[in-house]
Amino acid sequence: MSKVNDFGFSESNGDEVGITMSTPFLESDNSNTQSISGRIGSNNNSNSKNSGGIGSGGGININGDPYGNSGGGGSKTSNNFGSGTIAFMKGLTHPVAASVHVLFKLSAILLYLFSGLFGGGFILTFILCILLLSFDFYSVKNITGRLLVGLRWWNQVDPKDGSNKWYFETAPEGHRVNQIESLIFWITLYGTPIFWILFFLKCIISLQFAWILIPIIALSLNMANVYGFYKCSNSNVSNAAATFASNYIGRSLLQRASSFM
């Protein structure tokens, strides 16, 4: 026997609720009124058009939107980005060396740009930037240049007359260079000094003569590597990838950089 509870719903055994509602989102072809019924905490296997219960897994979608969309587009995008990054790293012969080659340069530039956001003053920013620039200079000169493009340079002071001699090494003729790693190496090598030239000009325009010390040191270290590897690539004419990257990309970037001076 049915009875009416305090909330105005008709119920027969205390756990089944019948709700009759009319809404344009639930209209059918035969009637403007549609019945949705369900048993709380149970599975409803009736033949009604729309039936389900809270906790039964059917009829009412409480995790997604009202129209039944799953909303998994964001996870798919992140998964695609992650898989693309992994595939790109697998295509590199020396992924760690390529990452280090970019990491120190990018870290020094970002630290110089956003030092005010981290509450660091000039002294702390100066020390951290010099450390990052020194790590970058050493790693490029001795590690990443040898691994990514098969080139290495160094200079030595002659103890007899005090003259400074430069030495340029290239890999043997059978050494093959990964073209992606070669582009990463040369573009970052020639592109980084352009940012420091812009920072140098900004300090002059804004009369920040204390902060100008960081771009000067950065340019000195970066241009030493640019000169050394440029001479190495010219002496290794058999390496087509290094010759193209250093001659074409390097000269165009150096010409643009010299136009600012």
Swiss-Prot record:
Residues 20-55 are annotated as: Disordered. It is a multi-pass membrane protein. GO terms for cellular component: Golgi membrane. Residues 35-51 have a biased composition (Low complexity). InterPro entries: TVP23-like. Keywords: Membrane, Transmembrane, Transmembrane helix. Residues 20-34 have a biased composition (Polar residues). Coiled coil: none annotated. GO terms for biological process: protein secretion; vesicle-mediated transport. Belongs to the TVP23 family. This is Uncharacterized Golgi apparatus membrane protein-like protein 2. It comes from Dictyostelium discoideum (Social amoeba). The lineage of its organism: Eukaryota, Amoebozoa, Evosea, Eumycetozoa, Dictyostelia.
